[in-house]
C-alpha cells in the first residue's frame, strides 16, 4: 500500500488480531496490522476449538484446512473430582455439530497468516509498534505514527494486543487491574499414552489440584496442571517429575495411569498467565478492542481462543457495516458490544465460579454446566450467569 489512508489499523497479531485482519481483507477493506514481535513466535496459548469457535473458522473457509493440518476431532469429556467420575458428556448433546477440535493456537494463527498473505488489501508489519497518535476535533484518532517513521490515517483503530494492551492503556486511558488467580497453571507436552488418545479427561481435587490430559496432534499429549502456588513451586522444583507423579496419583484414577507414567520430568512445563477480567466498555470514539485486551477467562473453560475469534468475527461484521457507510461507526461498535458482552460476561463469570469451587465437590458439581462448557451460545445457556456472582470490570473513559 502506498496511500496512508486505510480503513482499519489493528495493533496486535495474536489469533484474534490475525482473524480480524483476514475477515476484513476478505471483505475488501484496507487493513494494516502492527505487531511488535516477529512473525514466527511461540504463543503459549489455548489448544481447543469448541463449536462456537469452529463456526467462525468454518465461515472463514478454514475448517477443512484445520483438519488437514492435524486438528484433532474429539467428541467426549470426562470430569472427575477426588478420583470419582463427576460428569461425562458428549458434545452431540450440547451442539448439533457434535464435536470439538484440538489444535494449538499458534498453528491456527500460522494458517490464518498464510491466508492473509493472499489478501492484497492487508499489510502485515512485524517488529513494528505505534509510537504516537494524533486526534481530531472530535477526539477520534486521525493519525498514527509508527516507530519506522510511517504515518497512517486509519478510519478505525483496533486493540488486539493482549492482556497488557497498549491501545487500552495508552489510547483509551483505561487502567484496569487484572485479578490473577492464586493457583498458577502450567502446561507440558509429553508422549501420547493410549488412555489420552481415547478421551479427554479433567481431574480436580479437594486440595485445589487440577490436571487435564488431552492429545495434541497424533503422537503427543498435553498435561495442564494447577496447584496452590507454594505446592506448585515445590512440585516443579523436582525436575525428575517424581513429586508431581505422586501428587497426580492422589487424585487421578487408574484410567489415566499410563498418562501419569509419561510425565518424565517438569522442565517442559511452562506457565500460563491466568486471571479474570471483563471490561464494561469495548470501544470509544473510533477505537475498539477484542480478545484479551477486554477479557480474561480461566482456562478451565477451554474457551480463551474461542472468545477471541468470536470477538473478531462480530467486530469484522460491525466494521464492515460502518466502512460501507451502511450505519454510523458509533452504532456499529455499540452493536458489537451488545452482541459480545453478554457472551464474554457469562463465560468469564462461569470460569471464575468453577475455578473458585474446586475444593468443594458439591459446589463444583453445581457450577459445572455442560452447555456452557461446550460453548453453547443460546440465551438459555448464557442465562446461567444468574447462578453465580458475575465478574465485572468497570472501565471509566475520559
Predicted features, each with a name:
Residues 38-58:
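Conserved N-terminal glycine-rich FAD pyrophosphate-binding loop of Rossmann-like flavoproteins
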Residues 128-132, 141-270:
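Conserved FAD-binding catalytic core of PHBH/FMO-like flavoproteins
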Residues 16, 39, 164:
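Conserved Rossmann-like nucleotide-cofactor binding loop
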Residues 25-45:
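Glycine-rich FAD pyrophosphate-binding loop
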Residues 2-6, 55-171, 177-189, 241, ...:
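Conserved N-terminal helical subregion
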Residues 13-21, 268-353:
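Conserved mid-domain beta->alpha element of the FAD-binding
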Residues 74-78, 262-277:
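Flavin (FAD/FMN) cofactor-binding core of flavoprotein oxidoreductases
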Residues 3-5, 317-398:
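C-terminal helical "tail/cap" subdomain of flavin- and related membrane-associated enzymes
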Amino acid at each position: 500500500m502506498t496511500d496512508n489512508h486505510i480503513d482499519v489499523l489493528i495493533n496486535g497479531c495474536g489469533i484474534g488480531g490475525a482473524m480480524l485482519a483476514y475477515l476484513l481483507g476478505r471483505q475488501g477493506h484496507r487493513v494494516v496490522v502492527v505487531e511488535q514481535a516477529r512473525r514466527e513466535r511461540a504463543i503459549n496459548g489455548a489448544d481447543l476449538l469448541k463449536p462456537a469457535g469452529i463456526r467462525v473458522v468454518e465461515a472463514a473457509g478454514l475448517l477443512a484446512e484445520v483438519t488437514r493440518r492435524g486438528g484433532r476431532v474429539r467428541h467426549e469429556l470426562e470430569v472427575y473430582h477426588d478420583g470419582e467420575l463427576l460428569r461425562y458428556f458428549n458434545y452431540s448433546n450440547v451442539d448439533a455439530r457434535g464435536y470439538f477440535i484440538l489444535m494449538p493456537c499458534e498453528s491456527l494463527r500460522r494458517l490464518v497468516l498464510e491466508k492473509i498473505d493472499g489478501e492484497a488489501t492487508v499489510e502485515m508489519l512485524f517488529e513494528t509498534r505505534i509510537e504516537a497518535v494524533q486526534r481530531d476535533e472530535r477526539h477520534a484518532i486521525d493519525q498514527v505514527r509508527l516507530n519506522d517513521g510511517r504515518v497512517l490515517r486509519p478510519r478505525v483503530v483496533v486493540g488486539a494486543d493482549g492482556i497488557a494492551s497498549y491501545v487500552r492503556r495508552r489510547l483509551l486511558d483505561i487502567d484496569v487491574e487484572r485479578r490473577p488467580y492464586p493457583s498458577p497453571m502450567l502446561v507440558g507436552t509429553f508422549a501420547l499414552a493410549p488412555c489420552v488418545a481415547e478421551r479427554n479427561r479433567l481431574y480436580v481435587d479437594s486440595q485445589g489440584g487440577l490436571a487435564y490430559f488431552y492429545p495434541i496432534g497424533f503422537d503427543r499429549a498435553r498435561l495442564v496442571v494447577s496447584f496452590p502456588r507454594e505446592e506448585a513451586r515445590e512440585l516443579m522444583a523436582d525436575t525428575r517429575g517424581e513429586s508431581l507423579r505422586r501428587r497426580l496419583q492422589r487424585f487421578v484414577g487408574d484410567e489415566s495411569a499410563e498418562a501419569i507414567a509419561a510425565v518424565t520430568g517438569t522442565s517442559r512445563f511452562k506457565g500460563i498467565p491466568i486471571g479474570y477480567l471483563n471490561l464494561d466498555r469495548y470501544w470509544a470514539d473510533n477505537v475498539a478492542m477484542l480478545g484479551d485486551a477486554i477479557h480474561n477467562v480461566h482456562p478451565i473453560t477451554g474457551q480463551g481462543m474461542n472468545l477471541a475469534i468470536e470477538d473478531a468475527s462480530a467486530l469484522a461484521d460491525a466494521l464492515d457495516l460502518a466502512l460501507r457507510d451502511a450505519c454510523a461507526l458509533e452504532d456499529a461498535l455499540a452493536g458489537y458490544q451488545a452482541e459480545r458482552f453478554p457472551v464474554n460476561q457469562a463465560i468469564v463469570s462461569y470460569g471464575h465460579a468453577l475455578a473458585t469451587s474446586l475444593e468443594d465437590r458439591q459446589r463444583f458439581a453445581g457450577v459445572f454446566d455442560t452447555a456452557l462448557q461446550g460453548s453453547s451460545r443460546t440465551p438459555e445457556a448464557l442465562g446461567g450467569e444468574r447462578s453465580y456472582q458475575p465478574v465485572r470490570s468497570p472501565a471509566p473513559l475520559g
